[in-house]
Amino acid sequence: MDTLPALRTDIDFLTVHHEGRDMILVRDPLGIVSPNAALSAEIAPYLPLFDGSTSIGNLQIIMMRHQGGSLVFRSAAERIVEDLSRLGILQTDSYRAAKDRITREFANSPERAAFLAGSSYPADPGEAASVLDRILSLPATSAVRLPGPPCALAAPHIDLRVAERTYAAAYRAVRDLAPSAILLLGTGHALGRSRYSISDKTFTTPLGRVPADREATARIRAAAGTAASPDDFAHRNEHSLEFQLLFLQRLFPMEQVPILPVLCGQMEDLFETVRSPLEAPGIASFVEEVSAWISEPPGSKLVVAGVDLSHVG
């Protein structure tokens, strides 16, 4: 082992102060890293060296510099690599095998299971319903007068506990509708270079199962072409749609109202080559196909976007 493995790009590091010590918590949406895993903050200066190109000899040299020039044996550097590898935060063969297994399991499942039940909201159906009903009953902070029934809603996707009144105001505006189907758009936090990720899975929460319009998802995915991710794995851990679905399930008979779940990625890089994202491959045809689906009978369709107008994080 002469070259250090690269750090995983799909995990987050959070610095915390615990029992008088600075620690680094590792947040892994795949669940490969133990939820209780923490690193000593002393290892922080060495983490940038794990880029897939730095030699273990360079790690050894940096370690000596940080220890005031004291001799550091190669075995000490190797021990750091072994510890990080064992935790599951490096791009090793064992990590790739674990990720492949998790990806296959999700791809082969007909359902997208609730990811945040039991952490961001109760996993118990009765308790979850009570929490949502309490939020929906919160008094309005200001009166909103609409010229007619809304056809689209932009709602937050932050933790329910942080934006209760905003969620209440948003979903109060659509509670009297009777949509025949719902286009569910959300910020995709893990889409990489893909513009969209479209899922045809049945979404489940403690409140029940919500089917996808599989014919429509296939049609729209085909229209998007290379703008759409070839799979829907980004939906596995994404919260932006899951939070919207909970409120929709309290307002409408969602087991009978199919959804079209779409995660949307970033497009900033497109402006280096085009004036409008619609000029990029697949995006205009995606928009046209979605618009056609919204206009199709029977009944009226509702668009719900789990997005923040000024998105950070």
Identify the meaning behind each predicted range.
Residues 1, 23, 63-64, 254, ...:
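Detector for methionine-enriched segments
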Residues 1-33:
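Long, low-complexity, charged/polar intrinsically disordered regions in eukaryotic proteins
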Residues 3, 16, 27-29, 80, ...:
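Homeobox/homeodomain signature
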Residues 7-20, 60, 64, 97-104, ...:
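Short, charge-rich amphipathic segments
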Residues 22, 30-125:
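Long, charge-rich, low-complexity alpha-helical segments
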